[in-house]
A protein has these predicted regions:
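Bacterial Sec-dependent N-terminal signal peptides
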Residues: 1-28
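N-terminal, post-signal peptide beta-strand-biased segments of exported outer-membrane/organellar beta-barrel
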Residues: 21-31, 47, 74
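Canonical tetratricopeptide repeat
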Residues: 53, 163, 197, 203-206
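Residue-level signature for tetratricopeptide repeat
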Residues: 22, 50, 57, 167, ...
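Conserved structural position within tetratricopeptide repeats
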Residues: 37-40, 141, 186
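Short coil/linker segments at helix-helix boundaries
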Residues: 45, 57-175, 188-198
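N-terminal targeting signals for Sec/Tat export/insertion, comprising classic cleavable signal peptides
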Residues: 29-57
Length: 210
């Protein structure tokens, strides 16, 4: 299995067009700060659009580290979607040797040439999910006509969390997976989303008991 690790490292280092994971954290945080300031303004804070924009900026920061990542993605494709890993370790998951590719914001686990899961190391914005849900619910509260736009952002959160839940389950991080599915369900509990998908809650409970 050492050969697998060395092969993956060689592929990453030989890709001249590939770069380290690039996320413009400063720009994302500046956008959030701008929208937070607007939401605190008495006049602007009374408008649904202000809160929708705030929610969008949180969602953008949430999705940035893993936006092009998915379970089953070819490992060789990671250099294009995420850039070069900082390092590659050999780890054992469920008795199998797996390549753990370490990036600034996420560690991606590759087995048999495919991504089997990942674990986020550092968020772009701490607490962004809870803040996004609150901002989007506020937007809907102020103007229910914004419902479709609010739902789009909330479903982006739910889908992100569900994918994270699957990814964590595959690498034995059951507690993190359970929390991710619970958050996915919570995002869908907004009136803008209608009836939440009960399977999110089922998987949250299933992984909590694993």
């Amino acid at each position: 299995m050492k050969k697998l690790i060395l092969a993956l490292a060689a592929v990453a280092l030989l890709g001249t067009a590939a770069q380290a994971q690039k996320i413009n954290k400063e720009a994302l945080l500046q956008k959030i700060e701008k929208n937070e300031t607007a939401s605190a303004d008495a006049k602007k804070g009374a408008k649904a659009a202000t809160w929708l924009n705030l929610g969008k900026s949180y969602v953008e920061a949430i999705l940035a580290p893993t936006k092009d990542l998915y379970v089953g993605e070819p490992g060789l494709q990671l250099s294009l979607s995420l850039g070069d890993p900082k390092s590659i370790d050999e780890v054992t998951i469920n008795g199998l040797s797996v390549a753990a590719q370490n990036y600034d914001y996420v560690t991606v686990y590759v087995s048999n040439g495919q991504v089997i899961g990942w674990k986020e190391i550092e968020p772009v914005k701490e607490g962004a999910i809870d803040k996004a849900i609150a901002a989007l619910n506020k937007a809907y509260e102020l103007d229910s006509k914004q419902g479709p736009k609010v739902k789009e952002q909330l479903m982006a959160i739910s889908n992100y969390c569900s994918q994270l839940g699957d990814a964590c389950n595959n690498i034995g991080e059951y507690k993190l997976g359970s929390e991710a599915f619970e958050t996915a369900f919570r995002a869908e509990m907004s009136p803008a989303c209608g009836t939440p998908d009960a399977s999110r809650l089922y998987y949250a409970g299933y992984l909590a008991a694993a």
